[in-house]
């Protein structure tokens, strides 16, 4: 079996990972452009960890400016088998107040400015996104949250907006009435690209606010969010430390086939594939293309 390597993407407020030992920073080059930052390799409880702050140190990148393809490509090159995204979000439900964590199990993509696939002209692939989150990862995250006494919902739908502006009231009410759980700006196309790269993916959505639908709460501001971010970040770091202690050391085959997603996805005939695109796909799809 393959050794497990746990990747952690830190969202707003999470720019480092305390407890990471034997830290080594590496600036990995990607044919897809510049990633958000160098990755940090390290160990927690003898488990290999690769950490990347999504917005870079100092939060210099807005959600629309992040090079999601380069980030996922770099994490794949770093050997990541399982990826946890720690992401701030707004809530559409009373039962998901600020400070609550949500183990997202579905996504709705409302972004419109981002490159959302590694594949295209010269090498076409269609991966399934019916079940975008690894159920195995969610089980381990739920166990870690319970052990740390962190309030967490076991499921929820995350709608990803383009940003960087927050929702209008009409948008907020529309998403609430559609039954969505939380809203954020970063998990798409991140989840899609992780699937194309055959990396098992899960999101911990960390509620900071009620967006702007709630009649008893003011419209969301960055000041409100920052007040909650620090507490959420501390809990998230404890969650990761606990997850590392209980996470299997061998990569377990994904029950929904996330780590084999390309086996039935490629449609372009070998003789019609673009050699230049194939070079860029060496990490993401090398297992299939070389096979």
Task: Identify the residue ranges that each predicted region occupies.
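His/Asp/Glu-rich mid-to-C-terminal helical/loop segments that flank catalytic regions of hydrolases
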Residues: 212-260
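Acidic, Ser/Thr-rich low-complexity intrinsically disordered segments
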Residues: 261-291
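Metabolite-binding pocket within alpha/beta catalytic cores that recognizes anionic/polar moieties
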Residues: 1-130, 286-291
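Zn-dependent metallopeptidase/amidohydrolase metal-coordination segment
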Residues: 185-223
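Non-catalytic positions within long, well-ordered alpha-helices that form the structural scaffold/packing
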Residues: 76-79, 176, 195
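Generic non-transmembrane alpha-helical segments
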Residues: 136, 140-151, 238-246
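Active-site/ligand-binding-proximal alpha/beta "capping" segment
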Residues: 147-181, 267
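Short acidic/polar active-site loop segments enriched in Thr and Asp
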Residues: 81-82, 181, 200
């Amino acid at each position: 079996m393959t050794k497990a390597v746990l990747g952690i993407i830190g969202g707003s407020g999470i720019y480092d990972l305390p407890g990471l030992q034997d830290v080594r920073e590496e600036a990995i080059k990607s044919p897809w452009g510049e990633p958000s930052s160098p990755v940090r390799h390290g160990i927690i409880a003898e488990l290999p960890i690769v950490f990347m702050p999504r917005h870079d140190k100092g939060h210099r990148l807005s959600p629309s400016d992040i090079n999601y393809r380069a980030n996922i490509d770099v994490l794949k090159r770093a050997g990541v088998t399982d990826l946890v995204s720690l992401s701030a979000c707004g809530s559409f439900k009373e039962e998901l107040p600020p400070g609550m964590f949500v183990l997202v199990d579905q996504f709705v993509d409302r972004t419109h400015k981002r490159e959302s696939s590694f594949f295209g002209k010269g090498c076409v692939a269609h991966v399934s996104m019916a079940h975008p989150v690894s159920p195995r990862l969610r089980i381990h995250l739920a166990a870690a949250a319970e052990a740390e006494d962190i309030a967490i919902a076991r499921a929820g739908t995350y709608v990803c907006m383009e940003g960087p502006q927050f929702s209008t009231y009409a948008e907020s009410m529309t998403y609430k009435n559609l039954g969505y759980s939380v809203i954020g700006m970063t998990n798409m196309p991140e989840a899609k690209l992780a699937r194309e790269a055959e990396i098992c993916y899960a999101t911990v959505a960390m509620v900071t606010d009620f967006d702007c639908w709630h009649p008893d709460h003011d419209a969301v501001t960055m000041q409100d969010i920052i007040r909650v971010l620090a507490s959420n970040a501390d809990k998230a770091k404890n969650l990761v430390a606990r997850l590392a202690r209980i996470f299997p050391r061998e990569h377990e085959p994904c029950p929904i086939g996330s780590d084999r997603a390309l086996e039935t996805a490629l449609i372009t005939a070998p003789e019609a594939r673009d050699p230049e695109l194939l070079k860029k796909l060496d990490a993401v799809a090398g297992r299939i293309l070389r096979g």
